[in-house]
Amino acid sequence: MAKKGATLLVKLVSSEGTGYFYVKKRDPKKLVQKLSFRKYDPVARKHVLFKEEKLR
């Protein structure tokens, strides 16, 4: 069987300050900078920027 990759789970936290977050897998070898996505925040009811934070 193949080994599992070195993917990390990271938390994408809303920049709106609502506390809403998404969890995403990320390969540390391919990406050096932090992830940021524009996704829907249902608490704010609009699309906002989500930035990467460590998942505990």
UniProtKB/Swiss-Prot annotation:
GO terms for cellular component: cytoplasm; large ribosomal subunit. GO terms for biological process: translation. Keywords: Ribonucleoprotein, Ribosomal protein. InterPro entries: Ribosomal_bL33, Ribosomal_bL33_sf, Ribosomal_zn-bd. GO terms for molecular function: structural constituent of ribosome. Transmembrane segments: none annotated. SUPFAM superfamilies: Zn-binding ribosomal proteins (SSF57829). HAMAP family: Ribosomal_bL33 (MF_00294). Belongs to the bacterial ribosomal protein bL33 family. NCBIfam families: PRK00595.1, rpmG_bact. This is Large ribosomal subunit protein bL33. It comes from Anaplasma phagocytophilum (strain HZ). The lineage of its organism: Bacteria, Pseudomonadati, Pseudomonadota, Alphaproteobacteria, Rickettsiales.
